[in-house]
């Protein structure tokens, strides 16, 4: 057999030349100790703060404490599979989640993994969960209304696109119901073709029962609202790091719409539970505790999250992200640590009261304590015209009602004020799942403010409202369309409305 040395050496040279030199280098550490959802890892010298790491069992974690001789890692999931001495490898990426329209209609966990059994997420883009909020220059002041469909809020405590409005109250006062109605109210906008009118909804459930979240998703599905919503669920049975990261993940998903010239609203339900999860993580990482045992940077935790809600200017695409954080108080104590923090960060609060809730005033909004610091500039002209007086009248009514308990002989003007106040309070009640369009609210509030309900028994106010709306919807659709399109109540339209309201009032006389 003839061995051709030259040919063999040529082949060898060719193969050596084409030999891939890229050897994959992974930085690996070792678990020193693990317990309570925290792992101490040795050997990850170059790990970044907030970087995702992977354990042997496939469970992931996030490096939070970078100390001199070890790294404190919080574990996203169960720590049962992790043993001392196991290896941990860096992934090289900061925690990120999938974003985009492919997430609409889906339920995901705090890391963006689907948990609704509908297959993988159709998304190509990923974003870091914790990014810097937009600066001052790319922003624009809030000027468009974000309608909730609730008379008590849209008339008295208006919310604008890009605003952060806190929903605060004790347990079982209807905080989630307000958020749910706001989401359902966007259905008519999504039925139309106007992209600018559409408002995509992101709902983050933090530390809630799984049954509650499932119920919420079912309502969205039944009402046809899930198709324009994303639900992120970090339930009570999930690890604390998942409850901590879920709001940031939801925010990243909402920012996709904001940065692409679309509009979104995000509900954090609720941030008290996120603060508790963060406190648990911080204490286990041996960070020094502060007031109420929360770590010193719990204010920064919420401020950096809520500052990401913004109305962008023309150069940045005109998108917006509106935030509705929810805070649960204990026995109406608004002066506790977390509530005061979040009140000072947000642009106003909707304060819900247990007493009002049990009196049947639902939504149980305390109009005196609730404010919207920027929303009034976002109200439509039509709503401004009719709702201007209502807040003052209700404030006077509450003041008088307190005095009226003592005295029986009241003068005529006081009697008239109490009379009107009781009817306006009745008028602002609204059953769940029945949001009203802006133009319908204008008609109803017009009737209340202009005294057409004063002679009516309080029990008939609801029937009056339904009859008025029924008449407008069946016979005056052109009026509703005119007010909706112009967003103003012209003199001609006001006269038409006056006629309809007077006719309705006569039928009740």
Swiss-Prot record:
Site note Required for activity applies to: 370
Q: Which GO terms describe its molecular function?
A: ADP binding; ATP binding; proton-transporting ATP synthase activity, rotational mechanism
**Name of a matching Pfam family:** ATP-synt_ab_N
Residues that hold ATP according to the record: 169-176
Q: Where can this protein be found? A: Cell inner membrane
What is this enzyme's catalytic activity, as reactions?
A: ATP + H2O + 4 H(+)(in) = ADP + phosphate + 5 H(+)(out)
Which family does this protein fall into?
Answer: Belongs to the ATPase alpha/beta chains family.
> What is this protein's function per UniProt?
Produces ATP from ADP in the presence of a proton gradient across the membrane. The alpha chain is a regulatory subunit.
Quote the subunit structure annotation. Answer: F-type ATPases have 2 components, CF(1) - the catalytic core - and CF(0) - the membrane proton channel. CF(1) has five subunits: alpha(3), beta(3), gamma(1), delta(1), epsilon(1). CF(0) has three main subunits: a(1), b(2) and c(9-12). The alpha and beta chains form an alternating ring which encloses part of the gamma chain. CF(1) is attached to CF(0) by a central stalk formed by the gamma and epsilon chains, while a peripheral stalk is formed by the delta and b chains.
Q: In its UniProt entry, what is this protein called?
A: ATP synthase subunit alpha
List the gene name: atpA
């Amino acid at each position: 057999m003839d061995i051709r040395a030259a040919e063999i050496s040529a082949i060898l040279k060719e193969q050596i030349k084409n030999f891939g030199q890229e050897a994959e280098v992974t930085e690996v550490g070792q678990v020193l100790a693990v317990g309570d959802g925290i792992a101490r890892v040795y050997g990850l010298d170059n790990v970044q703060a907030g970087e995702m790491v992977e354990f042997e069992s496939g469970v992931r974690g996030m490096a939070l404490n970078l100390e001199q001789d070890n790294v404190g890692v919080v574990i996203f999931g169960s720590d049962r599979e992790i043993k001392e001495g196991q290896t941990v490898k860096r992934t090289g990426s900061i925690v990120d989640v999938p974003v985009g329209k492919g997430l609409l209609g889906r339920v995901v966990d705090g890391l963006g993994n689907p948990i609704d059994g509908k297959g993988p997420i159709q998304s190509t883009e990923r974003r870091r969960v914790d990014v810097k909020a937009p600066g001052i220059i790319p922003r624009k002041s809030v000027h468009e209304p974000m309608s909730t469909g609730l008379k008590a809020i849209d008339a008295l405590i208006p919310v604008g696109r890009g605003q952060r409005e806190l929903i605060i109250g004790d347990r079982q006062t209807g905080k989630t119901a307000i958020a749910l109605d706001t989401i359902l109210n966007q259905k008519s906008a999504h039925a139309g073709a106007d992209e600018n009118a559409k408002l995509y909804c992101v709902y983050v459930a933090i530390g809630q029962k799984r049954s509650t979240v499932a119920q919420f998703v079912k309502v969205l599905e039944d009402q046809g609202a899930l198709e324009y919503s994303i639900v992120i669920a970090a339930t009570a049975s999930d690890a604390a790091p998942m409850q901590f990261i879920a709001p940031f993940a939801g925010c990243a998903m909402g920012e996709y719409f904001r940065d692409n010239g679309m509009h979104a609203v995000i509900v954090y339900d609720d941030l008290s539970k996120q603060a508790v999860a963060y406190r648990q993580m911080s204490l286990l990482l041996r960070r020094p505790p502060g007031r109420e045992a929360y770590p010193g940077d719990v204010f920064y935790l919420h401020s950096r999250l809520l500052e990401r809600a913004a109305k962008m200017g023309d150069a940045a695409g005109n998108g917006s992200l509106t935030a509705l954080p929810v805070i649960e108080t204990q026995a109406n104590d608004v002066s506790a640590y977390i509530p005061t923090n979040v009140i000072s960060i947000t642009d106003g609060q909707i304060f819900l009261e247990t007493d009002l809730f049990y009196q049947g005033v639902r939504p149980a909004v305390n109009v005196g304590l609730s404010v919207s610091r920027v929303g009034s500039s976002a109200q439509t002209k039509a709503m401004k015209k009719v709702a201007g007086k209502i807040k003052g009248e209700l404030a006077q009514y509450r003041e008088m009602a307190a005095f009226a308990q003592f005295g029986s002989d009241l003068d005529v003007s006081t009697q008239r004020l109490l009379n009107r106040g009781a009817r306006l309070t009745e008028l602002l009640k609204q059953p769940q799942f029945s949001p009203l369009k802006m133009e319908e609210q204008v008609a109803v509030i017009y009737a209340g403010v202009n005294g057409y309900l004063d002679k009516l028994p309080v029990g008939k106010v609801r029937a009056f409202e339904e009859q008025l709306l029924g008449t407008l919807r069946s016979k005056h659709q052109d009026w509703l369309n005119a007010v909706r399109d112009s967003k103003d109540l012209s003199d001609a339209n006001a006269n038409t409305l006056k006629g309809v309201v007077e006719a309705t009032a006569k039928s009740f006389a």
